[in-house]
Amino acid sequence: MDIRNEPFIDYLEDTEIIINCVPGFMGFETSKKILEKKTCVDISFMPEDCNELNTIAKEAETALYPDAGVAPGLSNIIVGNLITKQEIDEIKIMVGGLPIEKKPPWNYKAPFSPIDVIEEYTRPARIKKNGIIETVKPLTGLI
């Protein structure tokens, strides 16, 4: 299914919440389409200002949970839900891109969109410093 050109939301009528897992460059428009009919949890980063989607969500009586992430993020939400429904002694959440069997040249397995993995290290970052949100060059203060 090509979500850019097909009315994918029609296939999801029986759902209450949709988890948007598309690459970041598609996230804003996909969340916009979802919010017209459903509540959306977006696990990816989107370069656009997701606050611009508030009007759509309010008019449709839906909600957006942006930039929720995978782990920490969606995995923790799922575990939290499980804990409310049953007794659990131990949970292991294992998410990552470091494979047991490494394959050159990268020795890495992208757990999500390779474009987004690269962008995590190349796009400007937002940080909170002394209570003020700043946009800085990638890896500022780390290397």
Where are these regions (language model features)?
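Beta-loop-alpha module in the N-terminal Rossmann-like domain of NAD(P)-dependent dehydrogenases
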Residues: 17-33, 47-49
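Active-site-lining helix/loop region of Rossmann-like oxidoreductase modules
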Residues: 86-143
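Alpha-helical segments flanking ligand/cofactor-binding loops in enzyme cores
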Residues: 10, 29-32, 55
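Short, acidic/turn-prone active-site loops that include or flank metal/cofactor-
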Residues: 3, 24, 44-50, 69-71
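Rossmann-fold NAD(P)-binding glycine/threonine-rich loop
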Residues: 43-66
